[in-house]
């Protein structure tokens, strides 16, 4: 079990991973890669996981995280000063950034080399996004009520 000091609302994932890695290494267990996945993705695709692990084992990156490419117009800022970050729309013509926005889904799967965890720098050095294209795979369910909503939606829309 991790100590109470690492169970507060402002505890970072980097702190928890560093503690866990130190505990494992103190027991003589050493790993080339650490995988982190939250339980909120019930439709996580095993082929995506396999592909991400293979990409990590190719040795090009220190960190690989799952991501979603948002193709719709994405805004940033306050309501008085909004700026387009990326995306496409037939209504809004952009003059700046033509790129789409990547949303981190590190809870879907985050693969990190232990050297990055020791430095508590999960997203520095050589970081790579693995873009997931399956919208069902990235569906996150955070609560019982969200789960019930999804199940009820599927019951209404799926016929046998």
Short names for language-model regions:
Residues 32, 60-63, 153-154:
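Solvent-exposed, well-ordered amphipathic alpha-helical segments
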Residues 26-30, 61, 159:
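Secondary-structure boundary/capping residues
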Residues 130-160:
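Hydrophobic helical membrane-anchoring modules
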Residues 21, 53, 151-154:
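A generic alpha-helix structural signal
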Residues 17-20, 117, 150:
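Buried hydrophobic packing segments
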Residues 11-15, 39-136:
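Conserved core of the sugar-phosphate nucleotidyltransferase
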Residues 1-35, 43-51:
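Short phosphate-binding loop-to-helix
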Residues 25-26, 57, 155:
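Residue-level signal for alpha-helix termini/capping positions
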């Amino acid at each position: 079990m991790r100590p109470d000091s690492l169970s507060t609302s402002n505890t970072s994932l980097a702190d928890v991973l560093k503690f866990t890695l130190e505990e494992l290494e103190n027991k003589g267990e050493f790993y080339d890669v650490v995988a982190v996945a939250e339980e909120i993705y019930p439709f996580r695709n095993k082929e995506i996981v396999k592909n991400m692990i293979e990409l990590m084992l190719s040795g090009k990156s220190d960190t690989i995280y799952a991501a979603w490419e948002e193709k719709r117009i994405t805004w940033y800022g306050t309501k008085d000063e909004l700026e387009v970050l990326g995306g496409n729309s037939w209504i809004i013509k952009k003059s700046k950034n033509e790129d789409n926005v990547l949303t981190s889904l590190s809870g879907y799967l985050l693969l990190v080399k232990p050297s990055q965890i020791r430095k508590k720098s999960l997203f520095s050095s050589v970081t790579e996004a693995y873009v997931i294209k399956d919208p069902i795979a990235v569906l996150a369910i955070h609560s019982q009520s969200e789960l019930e909503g999804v199940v009820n939606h599927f019951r209404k829309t799926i016929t046998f």
